[in-house]
Structure formats: C-alpha cells, structure tokens
C-alpha cells in the first residue's frame, strides 16, 4: 500500500472515533433528560392516576391454538400512579400495577412512561399519544426475578380518561402480546 492509502485509512478511522464521541455525548444528554423527567414527575406531579387492566391478546399468528385456548386474556388487577404534562404537552407518568398474566398468575410492573401527545381536533380534550415505558416486572414462570422492560406505548384519550396500550414483542409461542389498560387521571 502506498502512503496515501494509509493516510486515507487513518482519517477514516479518526472521523469514526470522533463520531462515536458525539454519540456518547448525546447519550449522556439523553440520560440526563430522562433522569430529570423522572425526578420532576416524582417531585411535582399534577395528577394521580388509577390504572385498570382491560385486555391481553396473544397474536394468533404467533401461537399454537392449543396454547392460546389455555391463556388468560382478561388481566384483572389495578394500579396507581402519578403524572404530569410538560410545557410541550407531552405526558410523563410513574406507575405501579399488578394484573393476572397469561397463566392467571399475578404480575407486578412498575416504571416510567412518556408519550408525545397530539390534540388533532378542535376539542382539546381529545388526545393521541405515542411513546415508551421503561420499568421492571416479575413473572411467576421466571420465579419472580425482576426483569427490565422497555416497551412502546400508544394511547387515545378524552379528558381524564385514557386507553393506553403496549405490544410485547417475541418469538413463536412466546411474547407477541398486546396489553391495554384504562388510565383515569385525578
């Protein structure tokens, strides 16, 4: 190889290293914002929330019929939380909920949720949300070992009542579950 190829390779690697540094700097900023949002939601809640699990649905294309016939898809339970709306109109919430899982065993979950919220109609009470939740759950079939979760969130609501939902991805006969609940703000 001639010298110009070495110089080109050096500059290519150098530019990649600089880019990695910027990515980590942005990750630090994101993590700081994440922590600050959790702290503010904990210390300065605007609302207290009641959570009522509504439905669990196992994607039929991803399960054997024998399994879905045995699964519980009525996850009765409940939970409480506190939430706030930020200056951009986005929702932030801290919550704890327990519900009956697919095997009809209790599953607790607690975490933080965030949704970018839009109000597409003239009636400001109607709102749509899209975001994520990060938290910890524990399941009977995993001996109640705490498991971290990072899942998508979506919602549709009117005033203080919101139908909120997530999808748990998975493989064949595992995961691929739609889970939804009602959230009432007080």
UniProtKB/Swiss-Prot annotation:
GO biological process: what's one of them?
lipid A biosynthetic process
Family named by the database record: Belongs to the lipid A palmitoyltransferase family.
One molecular function GO term is: O-palmitoyltransferase activity
Q: Does the keyword Transmembrane apply?
A: no
**Site (Role in the phospholipid gating) residue list:** 172
Q: Which residues form the active site?
A: 58, 101-102
The leader peptide range reads 1-25
- Under which name does UniProt file this protein? Lipid A palmitoyltransferase PagP
Q: Which organism is it from?
A: Escherichia coli (strain UTI89 / UPEC)
Give the EC class as a word: transferase
- EC annotation from Swiss-Prot or TrEMBL: 2.3.1.251
Q: Note the subunit structure.
A: Homodimer.
Write down the position(s) of the site called Role in lipopolysaccharide recognition. Answer: 67
Instruction: List the keywords (alphabetical).
Output: Acyltransferase, Cell outer membrane, Membrane, Signal, Transferase
- What does the record give as the function of this protein? Transfers a palmitate residue from the sn-1 position of a phospholipid to the N-linked hydroxymyristate on the proximal unit of lipid A or its precursors.
Q: Where in the cell is it found?
A: Cell outer membrane
Which InterPro entries does the record match to this protein? LipidA_acyl_PagP, OMP/PagP_b-brl
Q: Which HAMAP family has this protein been placed in?
A: PagP_transferase
Tell me where on the tree of life, at the top rank, the source sits: Bacteria
Catalysed reactions listed for this entry: lipid A (E. coli) + a 1-hexadecanoyl-2-acyl-sn-glycero-3-phosphocholine = hepta-acyl lipid A (E. coli) + a 2-acyl-sn-glycero-3-phosphocholine; lipid IIA + a 1-hexadecanoyl-2-acyl-sn-glycero-3-phosphocholine = lipid IIB + a 2-acyl-sn-glycero-3-phosphocholine; lipid IVA (E. coli) + a 1-hexadecanoyl-2-acyl-sn-glycero-3-phosphocholine = lipid IVB (E. coli) + a 2-acyl-sn-glycero-3-phosphocholine
């Amino acid at each position: 190889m001639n010298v110009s190829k070495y110089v080109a390779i050096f500059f290519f690697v150098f530019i990649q290293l600089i880019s990695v540094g910027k990515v980590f700097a942005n990750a630090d900023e994101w993590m700081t914002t994440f922590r600050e949002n959790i702290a503010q939601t904990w210390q300065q809640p605007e609302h207290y929330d009641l959570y009522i699990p509504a439905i669990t649905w196992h994607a039929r294309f991803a399960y054997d019929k024998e399994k879905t016939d045995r699964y519980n898809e009525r996850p009765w339970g409940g939970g409480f939380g506190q939430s706030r709306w930020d200056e951009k109109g986005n929702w932030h919430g801290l919550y704890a909920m327990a519900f009956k899982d697919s095997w009809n065993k209790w599953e607790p979950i607690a975490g933080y949720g965030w949704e970018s919220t839009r109000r597409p109609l003239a009636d400001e009470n109607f709102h749509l949300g899209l975001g994520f939740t990060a938290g910890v759950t524990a399941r009977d079939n995993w001996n109640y070992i705490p498991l971290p979760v990072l899942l998508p969130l979506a919602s549709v609501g009117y005033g203080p009542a919101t139908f909120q939902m997530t999808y748990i991805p998975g493989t064949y006969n595992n995961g691929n579950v739609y889970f939804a609940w009602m959230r009432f703000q007080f």
